[in-house]
């Protein structure tokens, strides 16, 4: 049986692969994206797992042994149970607050502003403060200059759904990296969020991999600055 198209990874750079998958919220097909990074020891660090399928499992296993399964915020955890069951030796990593929200979910360690020694040689991380209902962490893969963004901002330059296009245009988030109105409303302490973004702008970002939308291959630092210049 041929491999389904969305089960095959795309290589963006050395040690950086992404898996795209269908994902809908409120009738809007936002799509989802999982990023798989190969760490210096050869193990895999999996960001925001998409829906589990045997085909995706096989494709991930072909890249290396899974060491970490990462929920980057309080929303992107729905597929962790299936992936953690498939890879019981992998450590499940999540932000503070997810244990209380999903007590049945196995969580082995909580994220903070200090990268784990296993990924610190190649990966920086930062807690976006001022958004307690989201508790999102940004991650920056230094070797490839790749920033991983979950729900903080979308990046859609094309969409098949007219409803999604209309939604994004109404949110001033069409054909640019930008937060939606919902994300803006979730910023309860804008000064704290602004300070977090300013710290992220110190990273030498070229590529931005969003979980919803298309990968931004170039000009990531300027796009990030422009997305939050209103703050």
Language model region names:
Residues 47-48, 67-74, 93-95, 148-151, ...:
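Active-site neighborhood of phospho(di)ester-bond hydrolases with catalytic His/Asp-centered motifs
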Residues 1-41:
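Zn-dependent metallo-beta-lactamase
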Residues 109-134, 191-193:
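Active-site glycine-rich loop that binds ribose-phosphate moieties when present
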Residues 22-26, 44-50, 68-72, 123-129, ...:
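Short, flexible loop segments at the rims of nucleotide/cofactor-binding pockets, characterized by
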Residues 12-16, 40-44, 117-124, 143-146:
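Beta-strand-turn-beta hairpins that frame and shape the catalytic cleft
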Residues 2-4, 8-10, 24, 45-46, ...:
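Metallo-beta-lactamase
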Residues 58-118:
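Active-site HxH/HxHxD metal-binding segment of metal-dependent hydrolases
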Residues 24-68:
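Pre-active-site segment of Zn-dependent metallo-hydrolases
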């Amino acid at each position: 049986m041929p491999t389904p198209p969305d089960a095959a990874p795309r290589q963006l750079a050395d040690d950086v692969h992404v898996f795209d998958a269908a994902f809908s919220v409120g009738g809007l097909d936002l799509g989802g994206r999982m990023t798989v990074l190969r760490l210096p020891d050869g193990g895999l660090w999996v960001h925001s797992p998409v829906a589990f399928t045997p085909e995706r499992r096989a494709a991930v296993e072909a890249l290396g042994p899974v060491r970490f399964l990462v929920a980057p915020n309080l929303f992107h955890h729905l597929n962790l149970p299936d992936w953690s069951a498939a890879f019981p030796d992998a450590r499940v990593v999540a932000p503070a607050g997810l244990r209380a929200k999903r007590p049945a979910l196995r969580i082995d360690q909580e994220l903070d502003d200090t990268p784990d020694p296993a990924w610190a040689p190649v990966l920086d991380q930062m807690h976006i403060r001022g958004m307690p209902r989201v508790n999102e962490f940004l991650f920056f893969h230094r070797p490839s200059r790749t920033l991983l963004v979950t729900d903080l901002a979308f990046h859609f330059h094309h969409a098949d759904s007219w409803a999604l296009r209309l939604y994004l245009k109404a949110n001033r988030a069409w054909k640019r990296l930008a937060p939606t109105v919902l994300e803006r409303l979730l910023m309860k302490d804008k000064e704290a969020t602004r300070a977090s973004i300013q710290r992220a702008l110190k990273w030498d970002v070229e590529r931005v991999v969003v979980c919803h939308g298309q990968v931004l291959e170039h000009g990531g630092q300027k796009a990030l600055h422009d997305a939050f210049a209103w703050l």
